[in-house]
Amino acid sequence: MVTDLARTVGDLARVVRHCSGAILMGMDGIPVEQVVVAPGTDLEAIAGEYAGLLHEVRALASELECGAAQRFTIRGMNHRVVFAFAEGDLVLGVQAASRGLSGQIRYAVSRAMSEIGEQ
């Protein structure tokens, strides 16, 4: 299963245009699998920094009766980070340059999430 997860994360990193890295992590911010594409990308720091915020996103979605949180996107001047919540405590994240195509990133993340759900 770990090999399949590694392949899924690797495929996500290769498919997303201008991707700097992809990570499958626990809600605690601990990486399960990660693929760094661009030198200098620190996915472990991203996982650690966003872990608390992802907990808040999940809680807020529940509190506002939105249903289960599915995705969370951070758009900055230099980078875009998209997180998708898997079943249990897993989160899939991908970081791309701000010029990455939003629709293409969402589609690639959705495909990767369906693969993770099948494993």
What are these regions (language model features)?
Residues 1-119:
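Non-catalytic interaction/Regulatory regions outside core domains
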